[in-house]
Amino acid sequence: MEKYHKTDIAPVEQENERDETYQASNPQIDFTRTRNNYNIIKRQRSYTQFINDKIEALDLPTKVRKDAVLMCSFVVGSDREFFGRLSPSEQQQFFVDCTRFFAERYGEENIISAVVHMDETTPHLHLNLIPIADGRLCAKTLFDRKELQNLQSDFHSAVGEKWSLQRGKEGSTAKHLDTAAFKLKKMNEAADQAELRADEAESRRAIAEQRQVHAERKTKQLEDRQKQLQQNTAPLQAAA
């Protein structure tokens, strides 16, 4: 889980929604597949405007601090093997189940967005919400260490068991990764894939070179044979 302040929100929206101003610094994004991304929850306002409207509706007794956490973000995904077992419709249902879990736990009205990225190494869900409880902003208490541990356990019970996901060790990051670790994992996977593609390209290049050498050798043999035939037929033509 990642916490964001006011100035962080617009860049997160650009990355999540892949808007026209987004300049990718993430090498694993394949923009030819960006059209396959989809929203499970999408508001008709920007992230910032949605948050501002929600805070205004709270009618808080004091002004929101400049360093207040206004958005908490989760990245939910799994590995290639898991998604390889699912059909496209099953993949979509998995992310719907994930979104429903967060909506029931923290209130659908507090979810800013839920968008699935299909244009990276593996599909994954970005879910952003406003940390509101008891009518106030409270990221610190809403997502303390105990709650995050409970969240991991409850998510597995509600979603993981249904989809046969392995339960990670409590408190570990083996299966429950925060945003930065998840991105790092995906970048490493992308690097491995890029290296594999480079090896395949090098192999194809070597095969092409071998074929070229073979073709040149055959051409030379044919030219030599033709030259020999011409030399052999020259005396016959002269005698005629």
For each predicted feature, which ranges?
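N-terminal nicking endonuclease/strand-transfer module with a His-rich metal-binding environment
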Residues: 1-240
